[in-house]
Structures are given as C-alpha cells and as structure tokens.
Amino acid sequence: MVLASFLVSGLVLGLLAQKMRPVQSKGVDLGLCDETRFECKCGDPGYVFNIPVKQCTYFYRWRPYCKPCDDLEAKDICPKYKRCQECKAGLDSCVTCPPNKYGTWCSGECQCKNGGICDQRTGACACRDRYEGVHCEILKGCPLLPSDSQVQEVRNPPDNPQTIDYSCSPGFKLKGMARISCLPNGQWSNFPPKCIRECAMVSSPEHGKVNALSGDMIEGATLRFSCDSPYYLIGQETLTCQGNGQWNGQIPQCKNLVFCPDLDPVNHAEHKVKIGVEQKYGQFPQGTEVTYTCSGNYFLMGFDTLKCNPDGSWSGSQPSCVKVADREVDCDSKAVDFLDDVGEPVRIHCPAGCSLTAGTVWGTAIYHELSSVCRAAIHAGKLPNSGGAVHVVNNGPYSDFLGSDLNGIKSEELKSLARSFRFDYVRSSTAGKSGCPDGWFEVDENCVYVTSKQRAWERAQGVCTNMAARLAVLDKDVIPNSLTETLRGKGLTTTWIGLHRLDAEKPFIWELMDRSNVVLNDNLTFWASGEPGNETNCVYMDIQDQLQSVWKTKSCFQPSSFACMMDLSDRNKAKCDDPGSLENGHATLHGQSIDGFYAGSSIRYSCEVLHYLSGTETVTCTTNGTWSAPKPRCIKVITCQNPPVPSYGSVEIKPPSRTNSISRVGSPFLRLPRLPLPLARAAKPPPKPRSSQPSTVDLASKVKLPEGHYRVGSRAIYTCESRYYELLGSQGRRCDSNGNWSGRPASCIPVCGRSDSPRSPFIWNGNSTEIGQWPWQAGISRWLADHNMWFLQCGGSLLNEKWIVTAAHCVTYSATAEIIDPNQFKMYLGKYYRDDSRDDDYVQVREALEIHVNPNYDPGNLNFDIALIQLKTPVTLTTRVQPICLPTDITTREHLKEGTLAVVTGWGLNENNTYSETIQQAVLPVVAASTCEEGYKEADLPLTVTENMFCAGYKKGRYDACSGDSGGPLVFADDSRTERRWVLEGIVSWGSPSGCGKANQYGGFTKVNVFLSWIRQFI
C-alpha cells in the first residue's frame, strides 16, 4: 500500500514535472506542505499577531518546494487589519473597530451627532434623549437662547422649556416680549428681549431750550436743543440716549460768538480744522483749532496748532513748511551738497566767522554751485559774519558768474555753464515769554523742537544743526520727566538722543555731539565717528512705557523720529560784535553759540602761507560784551620764488648773509673821520632800548617758508653742466625787497664751432682727418629694404642737442619733394668710420622724430635745398659731439668772398671712386657765381646759381665734395674771437653730372645765411 502510494505519488510527480517543464511550476495543493504564518499588525500603532497561511507544492528544475498558495504574500493580507482595533487569527474580519468607525474591516465613517452611539457592524446611530433623526441631528423641542446679563428669565419646564418669561432688574426697562413660546416647528415665537438702562433727563441750557422727541428716556430717545437770539449753540443740536444709559455727547451751551479771520493756505502743508460749533455759524468761530502737518520732506516752522481766541484773534502766526538740509554746514561746505529741485528753497544754518576762513566764491547774487555756501551768503548780504539761517535756492543752469568785492569777501568771475544758486531770507520767528522760537517747547532751560519725521541719526543731527540747535543732549544719564511728557504730548514713542554708546558690553559712556563746545568729564565725552564700536549703534529714548522712559540703542542708520534742543542760557549772556574777516588769514572759533559770539567764546587767528600775525593770537568775548584785544593783522612776508633753472645748467640757492653791512671786495683801507678820539666816540648814536615785542624782521624771519620760496637777500648761483656750454645772463642773482631776483635770467647755450683737435685743417693736397676733429659732423643712414641694411648716404651738421641741418634732397624721394618716413633714418654723431662695426662707445646714434623740408624746395634745380631733422632724444655734448655755429650777416659777407678758403667734410666718394672709410676733408676756395656759371657753360652744362646758392672749388678740379657728401657742412674759420670758432656757411648740395673734381665744374652749396629765419622757427 505504501509502495503503491509511493508509485502513484511518483507517477503524479513525474506527470506534473513533465507538464510544468521547462523551468518553474505552478503551486499545487498536494497536502505535502505545512501551514506558514504571516506576522501582521492590528491597528495603528496597534500590536502584532500571526495569521495561518496554507502552502502549496511548487517545482523548480524537477525539484519540489513549498510556499504560500497563489504566491500569496504578507502585503496581500496584512494591510486590512491596520484599520481594526482588535483582531483574531483565522477570523476574516475585525473583532472591534476604533471609535467613529464601522463595517467588516472598519472602513465606514460613523455620522452620529450629539452623542449618538454608532453600531460597529451597520453604522446605525442610537440617539440620546432629546435628539432624533438618522444621525441624531434633530433636537426635540426648541433650542435654548442666550440673554443679556440684566435679563431675568423663568423656564417652564426647566429641562425642556415650552415657554420662557422675562423681567428686568431694578433701574432697567424691558424692551421686547415678556413671554416667548416654543412652536411646533422647533422655533421660538420671538427673540429674547433686552433690559435697557434709562438716560437721565437733561435740563435746558442757559439762554436756550431742550425738547424730548419721545416719552421714555431709553436707547434711541432724542433731545433737541435750541438757543434764544442772539446766542449760538455750541455743541450738538441733538443728543441720543445710548444703550449704556449715557447721552451720545456733551450737553451744548448757548454763547454769544466771535469769529477769527480766514487763514491763507500754507504751501506743502495739510491742515485739520476742529470747530467748537457748527460750521453754519462761520468758518472759524472762537474755539476753533487748526492743526498743520507738513508733507514729505518738509519741516514745520512755527506753531503746529492755531486756536481762535475769544477776542477773534488767532493764538499765533501761521507756520510755514520748509525743507531743511540734513547735513551739518560749516564754512567750507559747498552749495552743491544742499541744492534741491530748481526753485526749491532749502534751509541751512551757517556758523559764525565764515568771513574769517578760506573758501572760493564764484559770482554775484547768483553763484556757482561749487562756491562756499556760507561765504556766498555773507557776500550776498543775506547773513552777517556772526552766522544764521538762510534759504539756498537752486537757480538752474547759469554761465555768467561775475566777480565782485562785497561785505568783506571777494568773489571770482567764471564764464562756464554750471548749476547755480541764490538766497532767500529766512522769516524770523518770534519768541514767547520763555525765549523759545514759535513751535518750540521750554524744557529745563532748553528749547525743544519735536518732529515725527524719520531720519537716520546723522541726518537727524544735520536737521537740528540747520535749525540752530542740536539733537537733544542731556548732561546726566537720567531722563527728565518734563522731556518725556513733551515727547509723549507730540505722539512720539521713540526719539534719537545726541548720546552714543561706545560698547554694548560695557556701561554707557555718554557723548556730547555739539562739536563747537566740547565739555569733557566723567559722564560726557565727545563722539568721533572713527572710533571703534561707534559705527553702528546710536542711542534713542524709548518712552512707550507710561511709567518710565529708558535708554536703548539701535543701528545709527535706522530711521527714527527725533528732538532738537537749544540752550536758553546763551540768550542771557553778553554778546560781542562781529569782529569781521581777517585779510589773508583764518580764524578758529571756540565756544561760540550757533547764532553769534557770546561771553566766553574766543577766536584764535592764524595767517595764510607767507604771512605772519601781528597782534594777539587769541581774543575772547568778555562779560561786558567787548573783545579782550583788537583783531590782529596778517602781514605778508616778502620772498622770491624758485628762480628758473636753465636747461643743461643748475642753480644753487645760498641763504642771506647774517650781516646787513655792505663790504666792498678789494678795498685797501677803511676811511676814518679826522676827529679827536673822544669826539669820534661821541659821534656814535646812543644804543636803542630793547623792546619786549619782537620786531617785524624777527616775526618775518620765524615764518616757515613753503618749498620754492626764499627770503630777501638769498643768492642764486648759476653754473652750466659741462664745459661744452657757456652761461649767458647773470651768474649770480639776489632776492631783492620787492620779491624779484636781480640781474638777468641765466641760460646755458652750447658752445658752437669749437674743435678740440690741435691739427690745422688747412693742409694743402691733404684729405685726412682726426677722430673728433669735426664734432658737428653728422652721418645720416637710410634703411635699404631691398638690401636689408643701413647705408650711410648723407652728411649733416649738428645745430644743438636736438636738431640737425642737411640737404633737402637727402630726406626726400628722388626728383620729388615728398619726405621719406622718418623711421627710415638713423643719425650718427661722433662717428669717424663709415663701417658701423668699428664705432666705439663715444658714437651716439639717434632716431628721427620729425623731418622739415623747406616749403620752397625745388627738386628740379635743387633751389632751397635745405632740411631740418629733429631727434627723438637729445644728444649729449662731448669732445666728439658739439654743435656748429650758424652764420651772421657779418660772417657771411666776410666768408663768401671769392678765394676765401673753407673746409668740406664727409664720407663721400674719393678719387678711387670708392666711399671713404673715414671722414675726409677738403679745403676749397669760394668761387664767384659768374665764374661758376661760365665754367659749366663751357662744359656745355648751363645752369644758374641762385641767390640761395654759392660755389666753391678749384679751376683744375683737384678736390671737391662728391657723392655721399651731400648735406654735409662747408665751414669757415672765424678768428675774430680769442678762440677760433667754425661757422657753417654752406651745405653740400650739387655737383657736376660728369663726376667729382672736374676742371671748371665747381661744387654747389646751399647758402645757410638765407635760411636763418626759417631755421629759428624750429630750433
């Protein structure tokens, strides 16, 4: 039996294996596998319990294994148990559900209301007493209604009343139904009533009547008032009884009224009118209050509230709204920092003493925007030197600023288009009994201005300064109640204070911001914005607490309302007159009030550069209103400025000699008077008594001179940098008492035409030279691009450190007047050998900066054959490099005579028809123009020697300038001086087409004297 079962089982397994080939089989319940269990969670968060799961047999590659039938997994079964409150293994449903849930798996939401109980299987609601309906939503009977605290009610029956009876406490009247009933539809027959307090009856006003418009004096009852003629009703015409038992207003009065005149509109201001009587009686009856508020960036000047007095007058003058600069103004401030839109005035306040300080002003009446604004106001006559407030007005573009000398200030003229400004007067404000300006409050001997405008700390300080005040500053760390009450009265809760905290981690160190009168003590120090820790935190006063005010700090850049303060005590001090400006001097003011010079203030004077002070340095305003000393003077120190230093020279300044006596160099003896000795002694003047005051000379000698200024008597000694220059003018000059240097200006000019070579050039039949024998000789090389080389093609003559003269045909393209690019030329000075490789360190090579050819140059006949080359960098004069002398009319007349000998030099072709390797020279006699023309005519080469040319050479030829010598010098010896000099009379220009050194065919030279005026245009 077992075997049969095994065989059957094997057969079945084999058949199943064949059927489920090739890889994996489907599960079959063969009864061979035990149950497994899934762990599921009951409820959320709930608990874990096990659920039995049946397993089936599966095959994989002919091998059986067990797993849950139908590939069932825990995720397929467990989720539905999470909604249960209690679960049971094997039960295909929840045992119990959470509150307000129902159904097999607790998926339904119970809808029961008013405490109804939900059936967990069906969701049906079991209602409590007094409720019915599917969801227990219907209340049996009528709902209870709320009632006022003063209403008394009786319910019948108490638990589920069908009627309610109402009544009121004593002193109240019932308004509404005394009984309401519950209707079949579940609604009450009426609203609950109210208990209303009765208002007291009012008697008629004096000179008037009152009428009640209803019987009961309860809420809504109205009284109407009227006055007998000629009285006006002041207050409400009707009063209504309110629910609280009070009338809705004050009982009116009957008065005989007066009216105030109409008010003009105030620019940039809004106003609110509070009228004590009805508008029908007139615009501004007595008791009317008009309150002004300035818009935008405008500040109120004057009283913010005007009241119509019983006598028909206003309590004060109308205020104005003006823009106030939010930067502090000093004597150096420029108007550009304060200008607003065109035509818009801005109030500033200038300190005292600005006429005593420096600062440029351009214009008269209308000024340039870069002018010193306070000095301009004094110049315009809008302010005295003692300072004060003024309105600066943007005048728009302007271009004709006129200079003038007005009110002790000299303005400059300027003819350029720029923004301009002018001034308007500031209306003077009246002061009350306290001495404070209109709209200011007296607080502990101070005048306080309060504004709700918001500004950063520094900007707020600027506004206060331009109101002739400062940010409110206290001399102790206790806030006075009077200030707190004033600020609260203006509706402020926080306000900047002119105190500053150095370090948030340390106790407060209070700092006074008044920079004109700094008092240093333990509790009060001066603030400097550059100190560490001062950059961000500023002090403000928090007055929100009704019981006390406290100091706090916040960022200085955060806007806040603020209060300005001025000291009343200054107004009781003696005041000194304005001392006026100090010519050529400055003044530093100490302790002055912002609007003048009071007792105790002082002025310290100083002079401008090159001036000294004569008189008392510091003057003080005394208690009797006078200055302690006269104003000093600034006296100019006479000096000479730096004398001009000549090019290629130097000047040495020597101080004045210590004695005032004059000694004559070379005097053999001193002359003495022919008197007896006693008489001679008596002839001396008695000694002068010494003064305790320093003399003018002593004061002037103590003044420190700026660089470039020298005292009277100083000496300037001139020298040239080398022997290659000679000094023209005065070698020594002295600073005289007029501030001028004596003598003639000195200059160093190159020594021209001097050769250091001892060799005589006039060696007949010779052509050799020495190195440096002709130091003005210049070699001119041109870049030959086709040959990739520099070629020495012409000569030239050095005129000074920067200029060389040569022939025009050397620097122009062949047969044209077109100038070759200067970059294609190099100039050599001090050169001896043609070959550049043989040049030594004394040869100076320069590039051309500019080339100038005579504008009349004719390349056809070489007339006007002259050109100038400017060097990029000047040469240094040495033994080998020196300039040649230019001719004069006298030298030209002497030298250009027939037969006069001259020397021509260059690197041109020699008799072997090769270019010379060294500088060659030739001595040539001058030939008459007619002889020259005749010689060429005989050779059938007719030409004309113009007045700009001359000829030189020999009848038989022998020596001549040749190709390569063009542009070089033809010089003549000038022995009219002690030392021989050489003069440039000619420039090698042209020769015979047949060749060099031909008989009767002389060399042509450009006559330099003709072109002296043209040359001097450049050098």
Curated annotation (Swiss-Prot):
Residues 325-421 form the LCCL domain. CDD domains: CCP (cd00033), CLECT (cd00037), EGF_Lam (cd00055), Tryp_SPc (cd00190). It is found in: Secreted. Glycans are attached at N523, N534, N624, N740, N767, N912. Coiled coil: none annotated. Residues 1-25 form the signal peptide. Residues 436-568 form the C-type lectin domain. One of its GO terms (cellular component) is extracellular region. Its EC number is 3.4.21.84. Keywords: Cell adhesion, Disulfide bond, EGF-like domain, Glycoprotein, Hemolymph clotting, Hydrolase, Lectin, Protease, Repeat, Secreted, Serine protease, Signal, Sushi. Disulfide bonds join C106-C118, C112-C125, C127-C136, C142-C182, C168-C195, C199-C241, C227-C254, C260-C308, C294-C321, C331-C350, C354-C374, C436-C447, C464-C564, C538-C556, C576-C621, C607-C634, C720-C748, C794-C810, C932-C951, C962-C996. The keyword Membrane does not apply. Substrate binds at D960. It is an enzyme of class 3 (hydrolase). One of its GO terms (molecular function) is serine-type endopeptidase activity. SMART domains: CCP (SM00032), CLECT (SM00034), LCCL (SM00603), Tryp_SPc (SM00020). Residues 140-197, 198-256, 258-323, 574-636, 689-750 form the Sushi domain. Residues 102-137 form the EGF-like domain. Residues 763-1019 form the Peptidase S1 domain. Belongs to the peptidase S1 family. This enzyme is closely associated with an endotoxin-sensitive hemolymph coagulation system which may play important roles in both hemostasis and host defense mechanisms. Its active form catalyzes the activation of factor B. Heterodimer of a light chain and a heavy chain linked by a disulfide bond. This is Limulus clotting factor C. It comes from Carcinoscorpius rotundicauda.
